[in-house]
């Protein structure tokens, strides 16, 4: 699968742009704050239907118009497919091949992409929500139905929290507790099964990056892959926290509070790991995600690498560049200088100059 064309209208600082990328390596080069990451974000939007940055949809709209539009054309299984996303205010309209998709599985995982962004390096030391999001984004692309389970859980969670905050009687809260147990167990089961697949890859890749000197693990709070056991576990946890939930007016346990812990040599990476270990872990996770995605779906995802050379030292760059050269697939890389990539052997690539929101072939 490759992206053959992308058209942007009034997207952040990009008033109008059209790119026809190469099927292998594409470089977006320019100074900071010129529009490189915005372009990468627009490509990401075509596959994930939301930005990888925090914020509201309205923030994607530039100043030249009241709406923004991103259109992509893909070659998939020998057939051309189009994706169009229009955002007006807080409303988003998505069309695939000219039609609005009716279900999540018609959208997610159809045009897969994997992002490597500088801010992800801090995830091991950050809040649990960031690590959950990293895991869930990867999971959605191999199991689009996971999004339906996650949304059902969030809807139930919001309603249950409203009742708890209002001091509703236990019989009124009980049906929502039962629904929370059902949907929450499904979310935990999907995460557990994904990690069971990913962990062997993650460990092997990390071992290769660090020349076998260290071992890694990713510990998820729920270890069972049995749905009935997960339901009983969550039920027991909720019963234990009942008094605290009444006191604070919110749901105190569940998938929304789970913390996937990143470990190196049986030590919590967020507490004891070095910056280099954090970078190696995220690099290994992303590489494992790519390999797993290809195995599970049969499609090679687009790789979106945002200023990767600034976050990886020479050794880690060399490892990942070797990985990129060995695989077949489309890659988009942002950078401020060409020389590090040219020195790594990226001589056959299409280079675009990005300056003040305008994109053109590099001269």
Swiss-Prot record:
Domain of life of the native organism: Bacteria
A Gene Ontology term for the protein's cellular component: cytoplasm
Keyword Nucleotide-binding: yes
Pfam families in UniProt: SMC_N
Residues that, per the record, bind ATP: 30-37
InterPro entries assigned to the protein according to its UniProt record, in alphabetical order: DNA-binding_RecF, P-loop_NTPase, RecF/RecN/SMC_N, RecF_2
Keyword ATP-binding: yes
Swiss-Prot/TrEMBL keywords: ATP-binding, Cytoplasm, DNA damage, DNA repair, DNA replication, DNA-binding, Nucleotide-binding, SOS response
Biological processes annotated in GO: DNA replication; DNA synthesis involved in DNA repair; double-strand break repair; SOS response
GO molecular function: ATP binding; single-stranded DNA binding
Subcellular location: Cytoplasm
Function: The RecF protein is involved in DNA metabolism; it is required for DNA replication and normal SOS inducibility. RecF binds preferentially to single-stranded, linear DNA. It also seems to bind ATP.
Family membership noted in the UniProt record: Belongs to the RecF family.
Listed PANTHER family: DNA REPLICATION AND REPAIR PROTEIN RECF
NCBIfam families membership: recf
HAMAP family, per database record: RecF
Protein name, as recorded: DNA replication and repair protein RecF
Species: Syntrophotalea carbinolica (strain DSM 2380 / NBRC 103641 / GraBd1)
